[in-house]
Amino acid sequence: IYSSGFEDGDVSAFTGRGGVETITATDSQAYSGSYSMCISDRAKNWNGPQFLLDDKCEAGVQYTVSAAAKTEWYNSIKLSMEYTDASGERHYSNLQAQTSNGDWATFSNVKFSFSEDVSKVYLYFECNDKATMYIDDFEVRTAPVYPIQNDIPSLKDVYANDFKIGTAVTTEELAPQSTKDLIAKHFNSITLGNELKPESILNKAATLASG
């Protein structure tokens, strides 16, 4: 889907989340090759590079992202996904966190997916403070598709006379077709993961306005 070690100096696929960051290719740090992407002038901890997925990835398909990241000193670096739902609300999903001691931390084949009713889907990096951040060997790939095992009894059928078999899933977990197939085969009850939490169902602006 996309792969860059920034050896050609091109960082145009990435933008700053805060609008204040300076994003450049640098030969001062590199996980492999001679160059990496440098993100400096971060004013807040959530400032960092973001990568738009809308025109590169399809809804309902599972992907993996890999990268190497480091900061100037000890730090927790987070790889996350952001998307906007049909009502215009923005949501954030922490995919993985790694610790950098001033050395390179690696994110390897971290899975993600998103549903059809969302837009402005980004992968992004952030860390605990305003330290300069470096990213190298960034790659997004289509994840292997593993069909479910159909030649076994369905749990919901085995216990049909006793109780329901349920599971909890979030929107992004439910997006891949293989997950839908697995749930349809074995479960007859679903609990939404984060979608029923207060921040997902309450109108934040209206709540603040009413005091």
Regions found by a protein language model. Give the residues of each.
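Structural recognition of the beta-strand scaffold that forms the well-ordered cores
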Residues: K164-V169, N188-S200
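Extracellular and organelle-lumenal recognition/adhesion modules and their flexible linkers in secreted
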Residues: I1-I165, E173, Q177-D181, K185-H186
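Aromatic-lined substrate-binding rim segments of carbohydrate-active enzymes
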Residues: I152-D157, K197-G211
